[in-house]
């Protein structure tokens, strides 16, 4: 199975797999059962921003999800990613729908990682920014139902021609270049990621959510991972 670390923006409470009984953000380490969650007031049809940071000195992964009206949710979890992830990874965005559905639209995405090495005091950095997504976006690996180019956005899950979200859909987008996320000789490994998103649904219960994830470089969508598994995990263990 893939090795996955993720920050989930979970719109549907699957209490049977340990979700709290409300929409939440959570930090997932190798399992969809979040290590830590925080209540999130998801605003249907409004553009939100997610900001994720990690620093190997503090060994803390943190996320803030906010809306223009100032409403925000914060979650953090102490973890040493050296012990969890391989040295080289890919970073991506994932989303799913199930019986209930929503649009999982990404409007922009940026990422920066830095490795400050002991020996040379140099920093190896990888940085990318997408302020919009073109139809033929060469530097993204699209998996499942993910598509780019509609209105300059990235649609992670299936949307009909009139813009209605479709159920039982899963899609992911990964940056094409592998990221050197840690190195034994590095003094500091850090990264931050930001994406803006629009979740829209006419269902009484939008589902299922969007995640920023880090994985082994050959990661693919697990079979049967629509709905509550967010396109990340093969099962709910």
From Swiss-Prot:
Entry binding sites for Mn(2+): 8, 10, 19, 24
Gene3D superfamilies the UniProt entry points to: 2.60.120.200
Keyword Calcium attributed: yes
Record-listed a carbohydrate binding positions: 12, 99-100, 228
UniProt xrefs under Pfam families: Lectin_legB
Keyword Manganese: yes
One MF term in the entry's GO annotations: metal ion binding
Keywords: Calcium, Lectin, Manganese, Mannose-binding, Metal-binding
Annotated residues for binding of Ca(2+): 10, 12, 14, 19, 208
Oligomeric form and interacting partners: Homotetramer.
Function description: Glucose/D-mannose specific lectin.
Record family assignment: Belongs to the leguminous lectin family.
Other noteworthy facts: Binds one manganese (or another transition metal) ion and one calcium ion. The metal ions are essential for the saccharide-binding and cell-agglutinating activities.
Protein name: Concanavalin-A
């Amino acid at each position: 199975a893939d090795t996955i670390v993720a920050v989930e923006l979970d719109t549907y409470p699957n209490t049977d797999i340990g979700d709290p009984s409300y929409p939440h953000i959570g930090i997932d380490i190798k399992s969809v059962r979040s290590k830590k969650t925080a209540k999130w007031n998801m605003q249907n049809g409004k553009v939100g921003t997610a900001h994720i940071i990690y620093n190997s000195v503090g060994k803390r992964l943190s996320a803030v999800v906010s809306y223009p009206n100032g409403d925000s949710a914060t979650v953090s979890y102490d973890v040493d990613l050296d012990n969890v992830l391989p040295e080289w990874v890919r970073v991506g965005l994932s989303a799913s729908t199930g019986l209930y559905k929503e649009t999982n639209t990404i409007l922009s995405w940026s990422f920066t990682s830095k490795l400050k090495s002991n020996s040379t005091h140099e920093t190896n950095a990888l940085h990318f920014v997408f302020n919009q997504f073109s139809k033929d976006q060469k530097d993204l690996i699209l998996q499942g139902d993910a598509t780019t180019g509609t209105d300059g956005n990235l649609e992670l899950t299936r949307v009909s021609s009139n813009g209605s979200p479709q159920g039982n859909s899963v899609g992911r987008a990964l940056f094409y270049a592998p990221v050197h996320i840690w190195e034994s000789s590095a003094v500091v490994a850090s990264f931050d990621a930001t994406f803006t998103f629009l979740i829209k649904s006419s269902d009484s219960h939008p589902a299922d959510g969007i995640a920023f994830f880090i994985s082994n470089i050959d990661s693919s969508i697990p079979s049967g991972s629509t709905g509550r598994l967010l396109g990340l995990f093969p099962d709910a263990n």
